[in-house]
Amino acid sequence: DEVQVVAVENLPFDEYKRAMLSCDVLLDQLYSYTPAMNALQAMAQGLVVVGGGEPESYDLLGCADIRPIINVLPDENDVYEKLRDLVDHKARIPQLSHESRLYTERYHDHLKVAQAYVDFWQSRKN
């Protein structure tokens, strides 16, 4: 009764996005060190991501104050333990949700990323 699992496969993207709106948590790539596009879209919507979020990925971005991704190993027991802990501590979800949105705004905003590319290449011209 505490958890409803929504498994999705082979959905058109619009339907998939609608399905995500009914969720609080997204279990994403287990073999990743960083969140990929699926996780980032979910985080931008305020979902809590359980997936790749290694400390090195935060360090690379200079992100020292928030850790919104629940990092898991590609191991059934680790995934279970991390999900169980989240269910047992549901009160953490609103804060992690807020941090997820904040993370995407800080580090994955399209205008900031585009400007970083422009700045990089302009610095190489001189």
Where are these regions (language model features)?
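Short alpha-helical segment that forms part of, or immediately flanks, the ligand-binding pocket
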Residues: 17, 39-44, 58
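Active-site donor-binding acidic/aromatic loop of nucleotide-activated sugar
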Residues: 3-10
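Active-site donor-sugar recognition loop in glycosyltransferases
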Residues: 15, 30-35, 56
